[in-house]
Amino acid sequence: MTGPTGAAVDGVARLGRVHLLGIGGVGMSGIARLLRGRGVEVSGTDAAPSPTLDRLRELGIRTRVGHDPAHLGDLGAGDTLVVSSAVRATNPELLAARERGVRVLHRSEALAALMAGRAGVAVAGTHGKTTTSSMLAVALTAAGLDPSYAIGGELTGGDDGGARDGSGPFVAEADESDGSFRAYAPVVDVVTNVEPDHLDHYGTAEAFAAAFEEFVDRLQPGGLLVACADDPGSAALAGHARGRGVRVRTYGASATADVRLRDLQPGAAASAVLVDGGVPRELRLAVPGEHNVLNAAAAYCAAVELGADPVAVLEGLARFGGARRRFELKGEAAGVRVVDDYAHHPTEVEALLRAARPVAGGGRVVVVFQPHLVSRTRAFAAEFGRALALADEVVVLDVYVAREDPDPEVTGALVADAVPLPAGRVRFLPDRSAAAGTLAATVRAGDLLLTVGAGDVTTVGPEVLNLLAER
């Protein structure tokens, strides 16, 4: 896999022509859109055709399927190849680019170049990055600040691919999974939480926490850290920042929070009273869950720091309709609602299921969960089991291995066996289509069906809806 190169480029003018490997992914396609919007000649390749590639072509971006050195065209010295950590060092286009003297940048370094010269905001944390980044983009827009943003997910109802280039602050979702979030030098850091993950990369929880300290140390002079007072890891990071003389603003239900949440109602449309500087303000959302109230408070703090009017920010947050694959309603058939969510860490799964309960009302919460990564499944099988026990019925698929190699001893059965529910309420069904058939035959009117995970479990919901519509 290809990690950050350590290269630094001040702005996009020096990038030359840019070719992106894996351009169909949401992060890479967003960078392609932003670069094209700034007049850069952009091309890219991906492993398979997709609607994303079609949309990029409509913007004048040359895209091709498959990885072949010929797809580089006459790219040479002075031009740039952008890669992600998912790109293997043996990729033929990468090898050819290096031979030609093409500059190679990691995705995060390209994003840092786009952020250069703007009031940058980097949103990081083990959970909630995409939703918080999306909320912040919506809030800044509502306040008239015309933000740029690059988010690891699309806003519900939007068609911008999670990326937009405005004239105001630049909001970037900062991915900690490979350590590349240390490439940014923003004026505001938002850290929603710090809970060990990606130990395949970091090795230890201590190394994971240290990476967040390095991330905060990259803040520009006079910059601000927005941190969650309710999360121990984030609170510890706030202490580190204060020790380095960094300004800190905390949020949460904790009595120590600078922006405090009271009377929190985590129902289908969550709400709270947000107290800022002794002034109580009503925070109302159209999305469920305590975790989303916290995400909204983080977005509020960052937006106000950037000069947004607090009232306009809260009005924008009230209109936030969610991000794709974040409690996204996929449809309803035979009285069964299907919601899709990207949750892939035990804490995320627990927060999701707690948020789902009031939405389900008197109906059952049925979840089909796909573990993501062999390393994460091995490390957190027991924790996943405890979180999934909050559902009424559980189906576990096999592991989506993604960038890792399969391990016959690490399957979805590890998670299914760890769910402390009666055997009849937990099933291990490795195949997605078989799981969809079983679910369509067993769900009933009033149920809320959740498809959960960071892999291709998202295809199960539409398949179940089609089967329900036929019966």
UniProtKB/Swiss-Prot annotation:
It comes from the Bacteria. Coiled coil: none annotated. The keyword Phosphoprotein does not apply. Keywords: ATP-binding, Cell cycle, Cell division, Cell shape, Cell wall biogenesis/degradation, Cytoplasm, Ligase, Nucleotide-binding, Peptidoglycan synthesis. Its main location: cytoplasm. ATP binds at residues 125-131. It catalyses: UDP-N-acetyl-alpha-D-muramate + L-alanine + ATP = UDP-N-acetyl-alpha-D-muramoyl-L-alanine + ADP + phosphate + H(+). Its EC number is 6.3.2.8. GO terms for biological process: cell division; cell wall organization; peptidoglycan biosynthetic process; regulation of cell shape. GO terms for cellular component: cytoplasm. It is found in: Cytoplasm. Pfam families: Mur_ligase, Mur_ligase_C, Mur_ligase_M. Belongs to the MurCDEF family. PANTHER family: UDP-N-ACETYLMURAMATE--L-ALANINE LIGASE, UDP-N-ACETYLMURAMATE--L-ALANINE LIGASE-RELATED. Cell wall formation. This is UDP-N-acetylmuramate--L-alanine ligase. It comes from Kineococcus radiotolerans (strain ATCC BAA-149 / DSM 14245 / SRS30216).
